[in-house]
Structure formats: C-alpha cells, structure tokens
Regions:
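Helix-loop-helix module between adjacent transmembrane segments
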Residues: 1-4, 96, 130, 264
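Hydrophobic alpha-helical transmembrane segments of multi-pass membrane proteins
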Residues: 41, 91-98, 125, 157-167, ...
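Juxtamembrane/interfacial segments at transmembrane-helix boundaries in multi-pass membrane proteins
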Residues: 49-107, 112, 137-157, 205, ...
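Alpha-helical multi-pass transmembrane bundles of energy-transducing inner-membrane proteins
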Residues: 1-85, 172-185, 191-238
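Acidic, glycine-rich loop-and-beta core segments that form the ion-binding/anion-interacting portion
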Residues: 111-113, 117-121, 133-217
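Glycine- and aromatic-enriched alpha-helical transmembrane segments of multi-pass membrane proteins
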Residues: 326-353, 387
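Membrane-interface alpha-helices at helix entry/exit sites of multi-pass transporters
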Residues: 35-38, 117-127, 237-254, 291-296
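Predominantly late transmembrane helices and immediately cytosolic-facing juxtamembrane segments
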Residues: 104, 220-223, 290-323
Length: 387
C-alpha cells in the first residue's frame, strides 16, 4: 500500500500469495489443497499479465525519457507514451486487480478460500488482501490510463460488472446454508459498491469507496471471528444447526447483531457512511445504475437479518446448543477494538474523511480531463459529468 515504486509494488503483490497459500493449504479445512491451489492459480495468472504490462510501460517510458525507472511519479507523468498500447496495458492491470478484488466473474476463488481457510486466514483475506485490488485500480490502473479506463465502453463494462457483483453476491448469500460462505459472498456484494464509487469519479463517491474498504475490514473481519468462535464450540457452520442461541450466548448474540447491522449499513454504524457516500456521489454520474445498486442494500438486510433470525432468535430446540458457553474474556478483548472501530467510524467519521480528502481530491482532478472528454459513460445508465 505504501510502495512508490512499481517494481516494489509488484514484488510484494506477489509475496502476499505465499503466506496465504500456506495458511489455507496447511491449516485449512477438508478441501484446503483445492482452495489453496485455486486461489494461487487465479491470482498468479492475473499477476503475470500485470508483469507484462509493467515491463511494456517501463520500456516505453524509457524510450521517451532515457531512464529505466519504476518510479510511480515518473511513470504516471509519462504513461501517455504507451500510445496505442494503452488499452492492452490497462486490460492487463485491470484483470490482475479484478481477480484480487474480486470482481464478477473472477470471484469464484473467494468463497472456496474463505470457507477452507482457518479463521485467522479468513480475517486476513477479508480485511487486507481483497483491498489491494481496489487500491490497485485507484493507484495504478485508472491514473495511468484514464482515457481508456473512463471511455464509454470500459466504463460500461466496469459499472455493469459492479452491479452484477452487488446483486449477484447478495442473492447468492441469501440462499447459503453455510454462514461462512454467506459472509464470503457478502464481500463480493460490498466490493461491488467500491468499484461503482471508483468509477463514479466524484469526491464523495471515491471517499465512499475508501470508507467501505476500511469499514469492510472491521465488519467482515468481525463476522469471520464470530463465526470462528461459535464453530469452535459447535463444530458446524450450517445455519440450520443453530437456533435460539441468544438464550445461552447473550453476549455473542448481541455482538453478532451489532456487527451484522454494521454490515447492512445501519445509520450510526460504520457501514452506512461509505455506502451513503458512494450512492450520493455516483448518482450524478450513473443515476440509473445507482438506483439499481441500492437494491443491494435491501438484499443485504434480507440475508443478514434472516441469518440472525435463524441462528439466535429461533427456539432453542437442539440439545447440542443448550451446552454452548458464552464468549470468554479473551474473546471479548479480541472483539473490543473491532467494535470500537465499527461504532467510531459510524458516529464520527470526520477525521478519517479529512485524512483521505487530499488524496481523493488529487485522484478526481487527475481523472477529470478524461471524464470531460468522455462525458457519457454508460448508455442509459449515466449522466454527463459536470466540468
């Protein structure tokens, strides 16, 4: 995240795969090897495309400047030197980052990786690793090739895929019998909002995307921790195997409810701020697409509240659940920072928004000329961007 050298970024983009591969492959579930290999192949394939694009970009900039450099600022300044290669280089960067996000239809590795990964692996994957994809779009793919990224055709594809991810992820989550897989598909839906906000191109929408990236780490990380805690006690992730556990695990049920409501986007909790800013900021650019995206919020409420109702508010009718113990001191200490972050970001997001304002404003200014030359991004689902 802090690399200002494209070579350093690529090296650590690849290095991230190694520990996650072993976390899933060694300490994962029954199908851990399948999930680990699938995760590795998907992300490595995208990374190799990005490597080719980096080499081509650096070589073309060298022909213009005379310097063989991976410096971010210098490459950004002279990225226009790639000329007719720009669409191909953007495609290579975009595929690599879309796999990492993941954007539909590159998402199929994520549910398997989450389900088979141990709790710590799922938390790390959701809270940190998925964000490198959306960060890559914000930091490299769009700023390097704005004329391509914000062209009507590419914008149409990205916004449509974001909408599919939002709605598809929510609908698939709604029918999941496995609580961990439900949370995994909810990530596909949430990160669709991030992509919509990035292409929304306004200060509000880009800030909203960054806020969702931060909030998703708190909320989804907390959900995976809670799923892991109850799994240690019951050794099942099937929602139907629970029911009425609020009577024997009141603290767990209270925390799970708060975290689920934050993931839904309840006002006063962290999830609301980012989604509201994305929808507010994207409406001027893509009004119809933004209205369609709001259905994802409704579906999120449906699948999470329904899961809560089945897990903690039904009758306590299974003998195995009567023996469950509530969260201990160690587990409460572990959850406390996440709960503080969830509430703090929901009630007082101003310091975070102020901290990111200069970077988001620079991104908007950097991409504004390309938006002005391509004022209509999605036929039938967009409006002109104000100059």
């Amino acid at each position: 995240f802090i690399a200002l050298d494209l070579f350093v970024f690529y090296v650590f983009f690849e290095v991230m795969l190694i520990p996650m591969y072993f976390i899933i492959g060694i300490w994962g579930g029954a199908n851990r090897l399948y999930a680990a290999i699938k995760f590795f192949i998907y992300t490595m394939a995208g990374s190799l495309l990005m490597l080719v694009a980096i080499v081509a970009l650096v070589w073309r900039v060298r022909e213009v400047t005379g310097y063989l450099t991976f410096s971010y600022d210098l490459l950004l300044t002279h990225a226009g030197a790639v000329g007719s290669l720009a669409p191909w280089l953007f495609a290579a960067f975009a595929i690599a980052f879309a796999i990492k996000v993941p954007v539909f239809p590159f998402h199929t590795w994520l549910p398997d990786a989450h389900v088979e990964a141990p709790t710590a692996g799922s938390v790390l994957l959701a809270a940190v690793m998925l964000k490198i994809g959306t960060y890559g779009f914000l930091r490299f793919a769009v700023p390097f090739f704005p004329e391509v990224a914000l062209s009507p055709t590419v914008s149409s594809v990205i916004v449509v895929l974001a909408l599919i991810g939002i709605i598809y992820g929510a609908l698939v989550a709604m029918v999941q019998p496995d609580i961990k897989k439900l949370v995994a598909y909810s990530s596909v839906s949430h990160l669709g909002f991030v992509m919509l906000g990035i292409w929304g191109g306004t200060l509000q929408s880009v800030q909203g995307s960054l806020m969702i990236m931060i909030s998703h780490g708190f909320s989804t990380g907390a959900l995976f921790l809670l799923v892991g805690m109850v799994y240690e006690r019951r050794h099942t992730r099937l929602i139907e195997d629970y029911g009425g556990i609020a009577r024997v695990m009141p603290l767990f049920s209270l925390i799970l409810t708060v975290v689920a409501l934050s993931s839904i986007g309840l006002p006063g909790l962290n999830g609301f701020v980012g989604e509201f800013l994305v929808l507010l900021g994207s409406f001027g650019t893509y009004p119809v697409a933004t209205v369609i995206a709001t259905t994802g919020v409704i579906f999120a409420a449906a699948y999470l509240l329904w899961a809560l109702q089945r897990m903690i508010f039904n009758r306590l009718d299974k003998p195995e659940n009567e023996q469950l113990t509530d969260l201990g001191r160690r587990e409460l200490v572990l959850m406390a920072p996440l709960l503080i972050g969830i509430v703090w970001l929901g009630l007082y997001p101003a310091p975070v928004l102020k901290r990111m304002e200069s970077a988001t404003r620079r991104y908007v200014q950097l991409t504004q000329p390309a938006r002005n030359t391509n004022p209509v991004a999605v036929q039938g689902t967009s409006a002109r961007v104000a100059p």
